[in-house]
Curated annotation (Swiss-Prot):
PANTHER family: GTPASE DER
Keyword Repeat recorded: yes
Protein name, per record: GTPase Der
Residues that bind GTP 2: 183-190, 230-234, 295-298
Family (UniProt): Belongs to the TRAFAC class TrmE-Era-EngA-EngB-Septin-like GTPase superfamily. EngA (Der) GTPase family.
Pfam family name, one: MMR_HSR1
Length: 469
């Protein structure tokens, strides 16, 4: 499981700015998918081959109920589930009573805590940080999050005990195809897991959220290894407090990052709700292959089934490549048909093609439909190669390719999808502009050679005039 780092601190100390610096997520990564909104309170991050999940827990200490109520009702749940805590303070504002109260609470938890003093730009750092030593959390790490200063050094200190990511091929040998079953509470995730396994391996009750944590279940089917990941339920706001919901989502993110294929389970009777779309958004951001299972399809009237199908077509139109199955996990209807779609999604997500073949397809595509012009000059796409798997990433090099509009990018994606029959996975296309190797290089010609060239040019011009006469 990916480690979780929680950003803690009172309001306006710069946690969100620091979050953006760590995750590089000022713009939503799924912005290309129309109608999909994201709460940017949590995100994936990688630093020096170390992957982790970071959470901005919101401001502490200024709520109406006071620090104790806030810690009891919201933050304690979040902090208890974090592996590392970054306690952010404001170097400009200095040490406040609420900082001291938060520090007292944090010290009782036995967690690894790093004190980070933000906004050190524009102040005398040594003088400003002296008072923070009384918090008893060691030497403050200095950052200026708005400028990105000190963030890399902070990450090196914070992540020093976090191991580097495993070799994916070695991990795959042990676990086989890793399949994450995700969805809101009570949509039938655990029932589906039990049906896929053929036995009651996971306790499943009618109470939402009965699966308390992600459960990893290895099994074999028809000679093939699998690991099923049953995730804790993602709750609706209003049913439980915000922090619990946020960390339920973090558990889902952890499972997604560890999976090859994600099965998103939706309740046909409740219909498609925003949280279902958010879950799909998380899977897209993680770049994971995906299969949609519309569960509880049994005992629905013909009218309700028709309305559900229309809703599915309308709400899921931004992922036309995802296979959608109508199932009943309880009775097993349609469950067996999930496996072919899961295998196809897995194979598509792990596409491997030689640069020569990719470049040939690229050339055929650009010959058939030329790239547009930018500032009077046509975009030139020269060659392509694979940049990674899960999701399949195609890197295209050329001149001005970084100016490629979204509609032409989609055209290229559709071409690659059609040629390689890619189903059930997002396809990532990256553009890299070829650099001029001589750009910015000073001329090595000395003054004597330059003068000789000027004389030749003058001589040529005189000869040209004489010839014209």
């Amino acid at each position: 499981m990916k480690p979780v780092i929680a950003l803690i601190g009172r309001p306006n100390v710069g946690k969100s700015t620091l979050f953006n610096q760590i995750t590089k997520s000022r713009d939503a990564l799924v912005a290309d998918f129309a109608g999909l909104t994201r709460d940017r309170k949590y995100g994936d991050a990688t630093y020096q081959n170390k992957s982790f999940i970071v959470v901005d827990t919101g401001g502490i200490g200024e709520s109406e109920g006071g620090i104790d109520n806030y810690m009891a009702e919201q933050s304690k749940t979040a902090i208890n589930e974090a592996d590392i805590i970054i306690f952010v303070v404001d170097a400009r504002a200095g040490l406040l009573a609420s900082d001291e109260q938060i520090a007292r609470e944090l010290r009782t938890l036995g967690k690894k805590i790093y004190l980070v003093a933000n906004k050190v730009d524009g102040v005398h750092a040594e003088a400003a940080l002296v008072e923070f030593y009384k918090l008893g959390l060691g030497e403050p790490l200095q950052v200026a999050a708005s400028h990105g200063r000190g963030v890399q050094q902070m990450l090196e200190d914070v992540l020093q005990d976090i191991p580097e990511d495993e070799n994916p091929e070695e991990h795959d040998k042990d676990t086989g195809l890793r399949l994450a079953i995700i969805g809101r509470p009570n949509v039938g995730k655990s029932t589906l897991v039990n049906r896929l396994l053929g036995e009651d391996r996971v306790v499943a009750f009618d109470q939402p959220g009965t699966t308390r944590d992600s459960i990893y279940i290895p099994f074999e089917r028809e000679g093939r290894k699998y690991t099923l990941i049953d995730t804790a339920g993602v709750r609706r706001k209003g049913k439980v407090d915000e922090m619990i919901e946020k960390f339920s989502i973090v558990k889902t993110l952890q499972a997604m990052k560890d999976a090859h294929v994600v099965v998103v389970v939706v309740d046909a009777r409740e219909g498609i709700v925003e949280q279902d779309l958010h879950l799909i958004g998380y899977a897209l951001e993680a770049g994971r292959a995906m299969v949609i299972a519309i569960n509880k399809w049994d005992n629905m009237s013909e009218y309700d089934r028709k309305q559900c199908k229309l809703d599915v077509e309308r709400r899921f139109d931004f992922i036309p490549w995802a296979r959608i199955h109508l199932i009943s996990a309880l009775h097993g209807t349609g469950v067996g048909e999930l496996y072919p779609s899961i295998h196809r999604a897995y194979e598509s997500a792990n596409l491997k093609v030689s640069p020569a073949k990719l470049t040939q397809i690229l050339n055929d595509a650009t010959d058939q439909h030329q790239p547009p012009t930018v500032q009077g000059r046509r975009i030139k796409m020269r060659y392509a190669h694979m940049g990674g798997q899960n999701p399949p990433t195609i890197v295209i090099h050329g001149n001005k390719v970084d100016k490629t509009p979204a509609d032409y990018r989609r055209y290229l994606e559709n071409v690659f999808r059609k040629v390689y029959k890619l189903e059930g996975t997002p396809v990532k296309i990256e553009f890299k502009t070829s650099e001029n190797p001589f750009e910015g290089r000073k001329s090595q010609v000395d003054e004597r050679t330059a003068a000789r060239r000027r004389r030749y040019i003058q001589k040529f011009k005189k000869a040209e005039k004489k010839f014209k006469r």
